[in-house]
UniProtKB/Swiss-Prot annotation:
Similarity field: Belongs to the purine/pyrimidine phosphoribosyltransferase family. Xpt subfamily.
Keywords on record: Cytoplasm, Glycosyltransferase, Purine salvage, Transferase
Protein name: Xanthine phosphoribosyltransferase
GO biological process: purine ribonucleoside salvage; xanthine metabolic process; XMP salvage
Known partners and oligomeric status: Homodimer.
Species of provenance: Bacillus cereus (strain ZK / E33L)
Pfam family name, one: Pribosyltran
Gene (UniProt): xpt
Amino acid sequence: MKVLQEKILNEGKVLSGDVLKVDAFLNHQIDPVLMQEIGKEFAKRFKEENITKIVTIESSGIAPAVMAALELGVKVIFARKRKSLTLQDNMYVASVYSFTKQETNEISLSRNHIDESDRVLIIDDFLANGQAALGLMSLVEQAGASIAGIGIVIEKAFQDGGKKLREQGIRVESLAEIASLDNNAVTFVQQETAEVK
């Protein structure tokens, strides 16, 4: 997605060979116009999948998930990383290791909002080692719902998360795929796309 790649190049900051800071438009301050375009792109890519619900993880996945849900006309449920006083019982739970924060979180979804009738699109801001996506998949599978695919805003293609998911037969659609963050520079995977007529 060209507009996203331009935003990454202009406003993203490479902190190391593994870490890209995009807090200027995605995971702290949010650019709503960009999020709207991201939502439209996810909706376009998954429109034939009969999505009934979008699942994401708090907090950076919420904005792109909501915009995609708006385009698809479905609801969003986000996995919580912390226990809530209002959500104590009747939860699906999975453990997720955060590459960025270097910690393991228990994530949870209420059983009241997802079930076997749902066809789910998982959306997240980043895909690195795949732990968040695998945790979200576990929650969806615990509910008996089916997974239509995973939409990722930025994939670090030099890490193995995307490869692991695709090897499991999961459809992964990434809007920006980064080949490298070496030498303080973002290098994108060159994708050849065929026009569908």
